């Protein structure tokens, strides 16, 4: 058996998330079916992160094991040929040691959340960014974001369906930047709780529009209470950017 590592890019709009679902299409299902068509064998895809319905990826790392003489280049070509009906692309394929694991070997994950801050309707970025018509103060959002950086109990910022045993996470980076009408929120950590990034962005948006004071973000954090969450940002503005591994 050979272990192949993939880098996946996908538009999450038509999928019910990355992981296989009983009642709807998933990225995992599409890739596994493409692999079956390419290799004439069943495989199981393992990925560095889990994305919800409508969440996108620029560089999701995944792996599967297969018995084949195909080179990574030819395998990538076959997968992409069978993935054409879907908004999924394999942008890299390589052979990894048999003990390497896309999820368990990962030591860092990064996301970006895109907000388009304008009144005019979105066209190209529809379903690929969150449109906020009210003027946002990105500098206030940046100051509030720094109150969340560090090791904290993020109970307020995780969904009620979160299966993580421990709500304590170390947030390494949360940066807010503006480029014209677009505001991007960058988040980096070893791992995240379910809905954590979207929950943090939602509260930063409230700060940006003046509904919340900057200090209220910290107050919500310290409350350790999901009921104190101000707003959960919609999924379509969120992108899994990259997974980091030991060198």
From Swiss-Prot:
<protein>
    <recommendedName>
        <fullName>tRNA pseudouridine synthase A</fullName>
        <ecNumber>5.4.99.12</ecNumber>
    </recommendedName>
</protein>
<dbReference type="GO" id="GO:0031119">
    <property type="term" value="P:tRNA pseudouridine synthesis"/>
</dbReference>
<dbReference type="InterPro" id="IPR001406">
    <property type="entry name" value="PsdUridine_synth_TruA"/>
</dbReference>
<dbReference type="InterPro" id="IPR020097">
    <property type="entry name" value="PsdUridine_synth_TruA_a/b_dom"/>
</dbReference>
<comment type="function">
    <text>Formation of pseudouridine at positions 38, 39 and 40 in the anticodon stem and loop of transfer RNAs.</text>
</comment>
<feature type="binding site">
    <location>
        <position position="111"/>
    </location>
    <ligand>
        <name>substrate</name>
    </ligand>
</feature>
<keyword id="KW-0413">Isomerase</keyword>
<dbReference type="InterPro" id="IPR020095">
    <property type="entry name" value="PsdUridine_synth_TruA_C"/>
</dbReference>
<dbReference type="GO" id="GO:0160147">
    <property type="term" value="F:tRNA pseudouridine(38-40) synthase activity"/>
</dbReference>
<dbReference type="Pfam" id="PF01416">
    <property type="entry name" value="PseudoU_synth_1"/>
</dbReference>
<comment type="subunit">
    <text>Homodimer.</text>
</comment>
<dbReference type="InterPro" id="IPR020094">
    <property type="entry name" value="TruA/RsuA/RluB/E/F_N"/>
</dbReference>
<comment type="similarity">
    <text>Belongs to the tRNA pseudouridine synthase TruA family.</text>
</comment>
<feature type="active site" description="Nucleophile">
    <location>
        <position position="52"/>
    </location>
</feature>
<dbReference type="GO" id="GO:0003723">
    <property type="term" value="F:RNA binding"/>
</dbReference>
<keyword id="KW-0819">tRNA processing</keyword>
<dbReference type="InterPro" id="IPR020103">
    <property type="entry name" value="PsdUridine_synth_cat_dom_sf"/>
</dbReference>
